[in-house]
Structure formats: C-alpha cells, structure tokens
Amino acid sequence: MNMPLPYCVYVLQSAKDGGLYIGFTTDLMRRLKEHNSGTSAATACRQPFELVFCEYYRSKPDAQRREVYLKTSSGRRALKLMLQESLPRPPSSLSG
C-alpha cells in the first residue's frame, strides 16, 4: 500500500519581485495559502507566490536537511540550475 509522504520541501516564487522562498511543511496547500494571505511574516510583503518546486520525504529529518541544504550557497546554485527552464521569470534572489 502506497502511503503519501508527509514532509514537503517547497520553493515559491514571488510574482512581486521574482525572488524565491524555500520552506518545509506537512501541509503544502495550507502553507501556500498562508504565504499568499500575508499571515506569514517572512513573506507578507512579497505576495503573491506561485509554487515552482516541491519534494516529498518520508522522514522529517530528511526534509529538514534538504531545506537547509537548499538555503546554502551551493544549494541555491543547484536549485537555480534545476529550475532555470521552468521558472515563470528568472529568480532575483533566494531567501527563506
């Protein structure tokens, strides 16, 4: 029986400034709504956001390690390379 993987690392792109936001959650749709409603302090001034990437993990530590890696300089470079063909607009910055 295939169970859905509970932990998600996600990347959002701001329609306002093109910047990317990297996060981790167990409920992607709820979290996206929070970012787009302005209830998330880290992204309130940069909304609206579009989901541009997500990965699911079986364990919380694995997801957290991936989130931390994507926020490093080498992780940001790897992410930009992965997403360069699919982003609606070039990323102006990476934050998270």
Question: Locations of the language-model features?
Answer:
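GIY-YIG nuclease catalytic motif and its immediate N-terminal context
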Residues: 1-50, 54-57, 61-72, 76, ...
